[in-house]
Regions:
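Conserved beta-strand in the GNAT
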Residues: 54, 62-71, 81, 86
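Conserved acetyl-CoA-binding loop-helix of GNAT-fold acetyltransferases
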Residues: 87, 93-106, 133
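Conserved active-site alpha-helix within GNAT-family acetyltransferase domains
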Residues: 62, 98, 110, 122-140, ...
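A conserved beta-turn-beta hairpin within the catalytic core of GNAT-like acetyltransferases
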Residues: 72-82, 92, 139
């Protein structure tokens, strides 16, 4: 990472600091409520398929960004998805989104490479510009969603 004021580390265990930071960053990512508690965070971090990377501002020690890499195998091949890309409002405009995406690209290369996929709403103009500037190409596809209630 080129910027000496920031450091990226994989989150390996759930703790109060990580939980508070994830809650704060999720609130900045979406207006939709994302319930997050210690149990859920622990399950996510314990999963071999989910890698959460945290961006820390070294001078303050504050976690100011995150990115999630989801990876799993299917009959059609290895899938690697980028999710939950967010930089704290106070640290935006410094190229840190690029830094997180480049870090994940490097991690995927270490895992054997392959396609790196993500989705982004068209209304997120800055995010879409970021992804395109990193070499992501828009695919023509439909994404469908079905809400299934719990029993």
């Amino acid at each position: 990472m080129n910027n000496n004021e920031y450091q990226i580390d994989r989150a390996l265990e759930a703790n109060d600091e990580t939980l508070a930071a994830v809650r704060n960053l999720l609130a900045q990512l979406s207006t939709k409520e994302h319930p997050m508690d210690m149990e859920l965070l622990s399950r996510i971090l314990d999963s071999e398929c989910t890698l959460l990377y945290l961006l820390r501002h070294i001078p303050t020690g504050e976690i100011v960004g995150m990115i999630t890499l989801g990876t799993y195998s299917l009959l059609t091949g290895q899938k690697r998805w980028v999710e939950d890309v967010v930089i704290d409002n106070a640290h935006r405009g410094k190229g840190l989104g690029h830094t997180l995406l480049q870090h994940v690209r490097s991690e995927v290369a270490k895992l054997g490479g392959g396609s790196l996929l993500l989705t982004s709403r068209p209304s997120r103009v800055a995010a879409n510009h970021l992804y395109q500037s990193e070499g992501y190409q828009r695919r023509e596809t439909n994404v469908y969603k079905l809400e299934v209630p719990a029993e």
